[in-house]
Amino acid sequence: MHTNVLNLSKKLINISSISPRDLGCQEILIKRLQLLGFFIERINLKDTKNFWAYRGKGKTVTFLGHTDVVPAGSTRKWKTSPFVATIKDGKLFGRGSADMKGSIAAMLIAVENFIKKFPNHKGRISFLITSDEETSGKNGIRKVVSILKEKKEVIDFCLVGEPTSEKILGDCVKNGRRGSLSADLMIYGTQGHIAYPKLFLNPIHNSIPFLLDLSNLIFDKGNLFFEPTSIQISKIFSEKNCTLNMIPGELRVFFNIRFNTLVNKKKIIRIVENLLNKYLIKYSIFWTYHAKPFLSSSNFLLNLLTKCIYKHTNIIPKIKNNGGTSDARFIFNLTDKIIEFGLPNLTIHKVNEYVYINDLLKLQNIYYSFLEKLLL
């Protein structure tokens, strides 16, 4: 029963498609989709492979995924070769097994089985696949969505196969994502000899009260779908050409804010810059807006997927819109009916990444039931 989804997962894992390289993963998928009668549009942009595939007419159900993976890291720490799919103790090991080649295999096999049983199904099934999700994303779904909008393509429902499950398959789904805003802050002082602190302004000492308040900022209390907005300082360093007997003239601070739908970019920037001004800090700051938060408007889609998950796992999933960003934020420009669900994320981006083989079959069956409920 596992053979098809397991074999396809293994084929994809055996390709070292480190982002943004695809190296043939998508052609494996495309050939199988063509046999099912899908129209294929390759949308390759610079070093990134993308494709849009569809079959049928009417309301469109889109499966969204990525064939790229993060690097393996230190191969010496792996128990198996990261790009040789290996079965051991009921698990499938390999880079991308959980994030997200296993999910892509489950999607495709579910669609194959569905079309074989219901060749005259109503509606349209589509796939949107990229090889640039794990790194910049600049030539991936972001640009493809713009192209599809120009062509007046319509997506009614979108299922993203990101690894949303936590401890066990089916325990978590996502119907939204937090926004992300980063800051590169330069705090200025005056450089001088460390033995004469009264003559100079030490930007490190001067910034400590501000940094303490910054790290404790409360933007909101969160809501039913989102945790409170959070801020994390990621890097602090003084100017490079400063020896141990010098007061530095500059201090550079990097921080990131993950925010929900209760606040926006302008409000966050205003709060942070008001805090800087409160402490009379001389500064310059450069903001990078990575992603806007979103929340799916479709309780229908959430309830439908919940029933499918329960049918095959006996678990009612929790809604947890935490974690990083995903390509779902770009699809939100085409549809606000989005749900994310996939394999457990316990080992993603780690050495010895793996999935349980039984989970691959269960996920395939959940995706199949999802299609049944939407298109029959």
From Swiss-Prot:
Cofactor(s) this protein cannot do without: Zn(2+); Co(2+)
GO-annotated molecular function: acetylornithine deacetylase activity; cobalt ion binding; succinyl-diaminopimelate desuccinylase activity; zinc ion binding
Superkingdom, natural source: Bacteria
PROSITE patterns: ARGE_DAPE_CPG2_2
Cofactor note: Binds 2 Zn(2+) or Co(2+) ions per subunit.
Keywords, comma-separated and alphabetical: Amino-acid biosynthesis, Cobalt, Diaminopimelate biosynthesis, Hydrolase, Lysine biosynthesis, Metal-binding, Zinc
Enzyme Commission designation: 3.5.1.18
Database matches in Pfam families: M20_dimer, Peptidase_M20
Residues the record lists as binding Zn(2+) 1: H66, D99, E162
Gene Ontology BP annotations: diaminopimelate biosynthetic process; L-arginine biosynthetic process; lysine biosynthetic process via diaminopimelate
InterPro entries to which the protein is assigned, alphabetical: ArgE/DapE_CS (IPR001261), Bact_exopeptidase_dim_dom (IPR036264), DapE_proteobac (IPR005941), Peptidase_M20 (IPR002933), Peptidase_M20_dimer (IPR011650), Peptidase_M20A (IPR050072)
Pathway: Amino-acid biosynthesis; L-lysine biosynthesis via DAP pathway; LL-2,6-diaminopimelate from (S)-tetrahydrodipicolinate (succinylase route): step 3/3
Top-rank EC class of the record's enzyme: hydrolase
UniProt keyword Hydrolase present: yes
Binding site for Zn(2+) 2: D99, E134, H349
Active site (record annotation): D68, E133 (proton acceptor)
Catalytic activity annotation: N-succinyl-(2S,6S)-2,6-diaminopimelate + H2O = (2S,6S)-2,6-diaminopimelate + succinate
Functional description taken from the UniProt entry: Catalyzes the hydrolysis of N-succinyl-L,L-diaminopimelic acid (SDAP), forming succinate and LL-2,6-diaminopimelate (DAP), an intermediate involved in the bacterial biosynthesis of lysine and meso-diaminopimelic acid, an essential component of bacterial cell walls.
Sequence similarity: Belongs to the peptidase M20A family. DapE subfamily.
UniProt subunit comment: Homodimer.
Protein name, entry field: Succinyl-diaminopimelate desuccinylase
Natural source organism: Buchnera aphidicola subsp. Cinara cedri (strain Cc)
Record lineage: Bacteria, Pseudomonadati, Pseudomonadota, Gammaproteobacteria, Enterobacterales
Gene: dapE
